[in-house]
């Protein structure tokens, strides 16, 4: 392998190593009917993975708040969300143990609110902070 090939391979390896997986649990506390994302605030970079996992209280979903999003940010989030059920919305996660992965797209630094549609009335919400 030539020098250029080694440099390119090193760059790819460094980028892959820099990717962080953030695990977010979607859960319910049956004692007080509290629904939540845990953690509820995630600080990430473009390329990181958000792994949402239903622990209890299904069904759940992940919906990014459209209010205040630029058209570019909205398009980037929609493109990053596989199997969307609607604009900025994951499919419904109907069983405990279900997972949903989002690779953080190139977004401007800032805060991006999200919530669980079935439990929005219970204030099940979170925030993605882009560095």
Label the model's feature ranges.
Residues 2-11:
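Bacterial N-terminal signal peptides
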Residues 16-131:
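Extracytoplasmic copper-binding redox domains, predominantly the cupredoxin/blue-copper superfamily
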